[in-house]
Amino acid sequence: MKNKTFLANCALVLCAVIWGMNFIFQKQASQHLGAFTFISLRYYLGVLSLLPLFFYMRRRKALAALEAGEEVERWHGRRFWLASLGASLANWGGAVLVQIGLHVADATKAGFIESAYIALVPVLDLLLFRKKTSRRVWIGIAMAIVGLYLLCISDGFSLDVNDAAIMASTLCFALHILMWSRFSPHVDALPFMVVEFLCTGTLSGPVSYTHLRAHETELHL
């Protein structure tokens, strides 16, 4: 049990490192691709990268299990697809807003603003599900935000429209995390991720196609 907890915490730390590096690449991409085009390509590539693992896990019949080892009702059919769509909408909203903001906003400041979702998660959990958070967690959140501010912000702090878009994305990502916390005991994570990534990419597809067609028209003119 302790080993599983340690490995889970290590996985979360690794996710945080990858998440932080992500802003640098997103900033570079925002200078060459529109937000919807980037999101569509990004999540379709995510689906392609997950498919080999998905089929491998499916062959092995490796199903996620709770630490207690108790059988939990798994969602299939309509409930699974509705949960996937809900998570996809929250993820898509956050991804698009942060990509729009990064077109102008500084990557380090965007990373700091985006990290504010760690405070929104327990707040929304309390408001939506009446789940209380311990004082130690709130102290940890405050320390994390102060630390991230000192790490990311060096020349003062001001907000503009692009920063506001990134701030709005934190609400979407906080909702996304809450959805995952509620859905994860009832769904197999890998198929859920594949469907979520596919839906997120597809939601951006029509807009990105329209944008590319408009760009081609401008080039011909």
Kindly label every feature range from the protein language model.
Residues 18-33, 39-41, 45, 93-105, ...:
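Juxtamembrane C-cap of transmembrane helices in multi-pass membrane transport proteins
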Residues 50, 133-153, 170-173, 204:
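Hydrophobic transmembrane alpha-helices of multi-pass small-molecule transport proteins
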